[in-house]
Amino acid sequence: MSASSITKDIHAVGILNPAMRIFDVVMKTEYGTSYNSYIVKGAEKTALIETCHLTFFDQYLDNIRQVCDPAQIHYIILNHCEPDHSGVLARLTALCPKAQILVSQAGSLYLKNITNQPSLPITVAKDGDQVDLGGKTLQFISAPFLHWPDSMLTWCPEEKVLFSCDVLGAHYCEPYTFDTNMAYPAKYEEAFKGYYDAIFGPFPSYVQNGLTQIKALDVETVCNSHGPVLTRGCRLEWAIDRYDEWSRPQKNEVPLIPIFYCSAYGNTGRVADMLRAGILEEIPHADCQIYDINAHDINFLQGLLNRSDAFGIGSPTINADAVAPVWNLLSHVDAINNRKRPALVFGSYGWSGEAVPNLTARLKGLKSNVFEEGFRTIFVPSEEELQKAKEFGKRFAQSLAK
């Protein structure tokens, strides 16, 4: 991707990475991604907004040079300091001797540890601060937890362009700059939703705050950090509406209490059945279904768990631990919004029975309200033990009303 123009004085100089399939270890990126970066030229000064991943330094530098000499850059603005935004910074600053680096207060702390260069020429950009490039003003808007504590937005009122950082972005790569040229809009929408869920899903209240700030501006163009540039009359309004819809507080119509489990020989599954029976005896209107983790898509189960009012999770003990699919599901727990969510842990074991206490410890570490110390049976549960499981489910349901 070579440099392209957003407006007469704003240019996209970012990088396409269509081959990326995993981002930040855990995010699948079926449609690749882009590392968006922009140059804003005023009559007197030039600003570079965001940089890119270190892997692409040479190509990125060539894109910058298509627009300006790096030595003529006065400001390097990082709306967010994650390495996909700041990766080339340490090398780039050597070519930009007059450039001041503008970041948020939190960003100034992160950047020193990301670059290991404590002498970088960093200036903290506070909420409401601005720089004048000569006919072009860049105003800074604090946007913490969208999606890091350091995040901010940069607004150019003269051009009605918002540099939105990761907000309204997507891990999606087509060889076009604008949303008006997308060849596969359905795939983009899929990537947009997946990106929101993974990046912003844990922060709905902050998303609402950010939308309030964005809606107060007369935005015609959103230059985000990943995916196509969004324009008024095409995808911009749609994207804002989706964020608004997805981040609004939602209450389940009936109590949602899913029970997730894995079972080697069906014994943990039998316990799950009885726990469900006990829960429904106390809360008959609850949506309490049982899900064999190996039989369902992990993303579906993740969404269900994170929407739940309470949940159960069960595992046999194999090799002195819970089994891998159960740990995999818990690795997708929204650790921020899961705090104080009631959880019930159960399982059958043959020898030592570590699965239940290990899962209990993990959920307590996530600040879940784990019910008692869980429920365990040895090998095949007897009828008496199954009745105890049902009573355990009833007591768990009763605890939800307290």
Predicted stretch roles:
Residues 55-102:
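Active-site metal-binding motif and surrounding structural segment of the metallo-beta-lactamase
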Residues 3-66, 153-156, 160-164, 268:
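Conserved beta-strand hairpin/beta-sheet module of binuclear metal-dependent hydrolase folds
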Residues 174, 184-222, 227-229, 274-291, ...:
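FMN-binding flavodoxin-like domain, especially the glycine-rich phosphate-binding loop
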Residues 226-255:
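Terminal amphipathic helices with adjacent charged low-complexity linkers/tails
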Residues 49-51, 73-81, 101-105, 162-165, ...:
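Active-site neighborhood of phospho(di)ester-bond hydrolases with catalytic His/Asp-centered motifs
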Residues 88, 296-301:
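Short acidic active-site motifs
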Residues 5-8, 103-151, 203-209:
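Metallo-beta-lactamase
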Residues 147-151, 159, 167-201, 246-252:
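Active-site-proximal loop/helix segment associated with metal-binding centers of metalloenzymes
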